[in-house]
Protein backbone atom coordinates (compact mmCIF):
# COMPACT_ATOMS: atom_id res chain seq x y z
CA UNK A 1 0.00 0.00 0.00
CA UNK A 2 2.81 2.43 0.91
CA UNK A 3 4.57 1.56 -2.34
CA UNK A 4 1.47 2.46 -4.39
CA UNK A 5 1.12 5.76 -2.52
CA UNK A 6 4.77 6.65 -3.15
CA UNK A 7 4.51 5.77 -6.83
CA UNK A 8 1.31 7.79 -7.14
CA UNK A 9 2.94 10.82 -5.51
CA UNK A 10 5.94 10.55 -7.82
CA UNK A 11 3.72 10.36 -10.89
CA UNK A 12 1.63 13.34 -9.75
CA UNK A 13 4.83 15.30 -9.08
CA UNK A 14 6.18 14.57 -12.54
CA UNK A 15 2.90 15.61 -14.15
CA UNK A 16 2.82 18.86 -12.18
CA UNK A 17 6.44 19.71 -12.94
CA UNK A 18 6.18 19.07 -16.67
CA UNK A 19 2.83 20.82 -16.94
CA UNK A 20 4.03 24.00 -15.24
CA UNK A 21 6.59 24.96 -17.88
CA UNK A 22 6.36 28.39 -19.42
CA UNK A 23 4.69 28.35 -22.83
CA UNK A 24 7.10 29.43 -25.53
CA UNK A 25 4.33 31.23 -27.47
CA UNK A 26 2.26 33.55 -25.27
CA UNK A 27 -0.95 35.00 -26.66
CA UNK A 28 -1.35 38.66 -25.73
CA UNK A 29 -4.04 41.30 -26.16
CA UNK A 30 -3.73 44.49 -28.17
CA UNK A 31 -3.38 46.42 -24.90
CA UNK A 32 -0.51 44.13 -23.85
CA UNK A 33 1.20 44.85 -27.17
CA UNK A 34 0.77 48.60 -26.76
CA UNK A 35 2.26 48.44 -23.25
CA UNK A 36 5.26 46.42 -24.46
CA UNK A 37 5.88 48.87 -27.31
CA UNK A 38 5.47 51.94 -25.07
CA UNK A 39 7.85 50.38 -22.52
CA UNK A 40 10.41 50.00 -25.33
CA UNK A 41 10.64 46.24 -24.78
CA UNK A 42 12.58 43.87 -27.02
CA UNK A 43 10.66 40.75 -28.05
CA UNK A 44 9.57 38.43 -30.82
CA UNK A 45 6.02 39.05 -32.06
CA UNK A 46 3.99 36.62 -34.12
CA UNK A 47 0.87 37.88 -35.84
CA UNK A 48 -1.54 35.05 -36.59
CA UNK A 49 -5.25 34.38 -37.03
CA UNK A 50 -7.74 31.57 -36.61
CA UNK A 51 -8.48 29.50 -39.70
CA UNK A 52 -5.11 30.33 -41.25
CA UNK A 53 -3.68 27.19 -42.86
CA UNK A 54 -0.16 28.63 -42.93
CA UNK A 55 -0.40 29.50 -39.21
CA UNK A 56 -1.50 25.94 -38.40
CA UNK A 57 1.47 24.59 -40.37
CA UNK A 58 3.98 27.10 -38.98
CA UNK A 59 3.15 27.25 -35.26
CA UNK A 60 4.25 23.72 -34.25
CA UNK A 61 7.61 24.26 -35.98
CA UNK A 62 7.98 27.76 -34.51
CA UNK A 63 7.17 26.52 -30.99
CA UNK A 64 9.68 23.67 -31.38
CA UNK A 65 12.45 26.10 -32.32
CA UNK A 66 11.52 28.51 -29.51
CA UNK A 67 11.66 25.64 -27.01
CA UNK A 68 14.92 24.30 -28.42
CA UNK A 69 16.61 27.68 -27.89
CA UNK A 70 14.74 28.52 -24.68
CA UNK A 71 13.03 31.55 -26.23
CA UNK A 72 9.57 33.01 -25.84
CA UNK A 73 7.48 34.98 -28.30
CA UNK A 74 4.34 37.04 -27.98
CA UNK A 75 1.43 36.21 -30.28
CA UNK A 76 -1.37 38.49 -31.42
CA UNK A 77 -4.38 36.69 -32.89
CA UNK A 78 -6.03 39.07 -35.37
CA UNK A 79 -9.28 37.10 -35.15
CA UNK A 80 -9.66 38.01 -31.47
CA UNK A 81 -9.13 41.76 -31.95
CA UNK A 82 -11.70 44.45 -32.56
CA UNK A 83 -11.92 45.86 -36.07
CA UNK A 84 -10.19 49.03 -34.87
CA UNK A 85 -7.33 47.12 -33.20
CA UNK A 86 -6.95 44.93 -36.28
CA UNK A 87 -6.66 47.98 -38.53
CA UNK A 88 -4.11 49.59 -36.20
CA UNK A 89 -1.88 46.51 -36.27
CA UNK A 90 -2.20 46.06 -40.02
CA UNK A 91 -1.30 49.72 -40.57
CA UNK A 92 1.50 49.77 -37.99
CA UNK A 93 3.24 46.73 -39.45
CA UNK A 94 1.88 46.68 -43.02
CA UNK A 95 0.78 43.05 -42.65
CA UNK A 96 0.40 41.26 -45.97
CA UNK A 97 -0.41 37.81 -44.59
CA UNK A 98 -0.20 35.49 -41.64
CA UNK A 99 1.75 34.21 -39.94
CA UNK A 100 4.16 37.13 -39.73
CA UNK A 101 6.97 37.14 -37.18
CA UNK A 102 8.42 40.54 -36.34
CA UNK A 103 11.52 41.17 -34.25
CA UNK A 104 10.91 44.18 -32.00
CA UNK A 105 13.88 46.00 -30.48
CA UNK A 106 13.27 48.67 -27.87
CA UNK A 107 9.66 49.03 -29.00
CA UNK A 108 10.37 49.29 -32.73
CA UNK A 109 10.99 47.08 -35.72
CA UNK A 110 14.56 47.82 -36.88
CA UNK A 111 14.26 46.07 -40.25
CA UNK A 112 11.40 44.62 -42.26
CA UNK A 113 13.89 42.28 -43.94
CA UNK A 114 14.26 40.32 -40.69
CA UNK A 115 10.62 39.21 -40.75
CA UNK A 116 9.42 35.66 -41.15
CA UNK A 117 6.36 35.68 -43.41
CA UNK A 118 4.29 32.58 -44.10
CA UNK A 119 4.86 28.96 -43.16
CA UNK A 120 8.61 28.41 -43.14
CA UNK A 121 10.78 25.45 -42.18
CA UNK A 122 12.91 25.02 -39.07
CA UNK A 123 16.20 25.96 -40.76
CA UNK A 124 14.75 29.23 -42.07
CA UNK A 125 13.37 30.14 -38.63
CA UNK A 126 16.73 29.37 -36.97
CA UNK A 127 18.55 31.49 -39.57
CA UNK A 128 16.22 34.46 -38.98
CA UNK A 129 16.53 34.12 -35.20
CA UNK A 130 20.30 34.14 -35.64
CA UNK A 131 20.23 37.24 -37.84
CA UNK A 132 18.02 38.98 -35.27
CA UNK A 133 20.51 38.10 -32.54
CA UNK A 134 18.32 35.72 -30.55
CA UNK A 135 20.55 32.70 -31.06
CA UNK A 136 24.23 32.32 -31.78
CA UNK A 137 23.88 29.21 -33.93
CA UNK A 138 22.36 29.87 -37.34
CA UNK A 139 22.40 27.66 -40.37
Regions found by a protein language model. Give the residues of each.
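Positively charged n-region of N-terminal signal peptides that target proteins for export
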Residues: 1-6
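Sec-dependent N-terminal signal peptides
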Residues: 7-14
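C-terminal motif of bacterial Sec signal peptides marking the signal peptidase cleavage site
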Residues: 16-19
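Bacterial signal peptide processing site
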Residues: 21-23
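Local sequence-structure signature of Cys/Sec-based thiol-disulfide redox active-site neighborhoods
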Residues: 34-71
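Thiol-based oxidoreductase modules, predominantly thioredoxin-like and allied folds used
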Residues: 47, 70-86
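Structural micro-motif
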Residues: 90-104
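Non-catalytic, surface beta->alpha helical segment in thiol-disulfide oxidoreductase systems
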Residues: 102-139
Amino acid sequence: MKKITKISLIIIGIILLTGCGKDSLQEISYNDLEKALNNKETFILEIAQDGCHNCEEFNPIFKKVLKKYNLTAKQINLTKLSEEENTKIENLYNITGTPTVIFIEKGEEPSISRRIIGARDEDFIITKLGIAGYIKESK
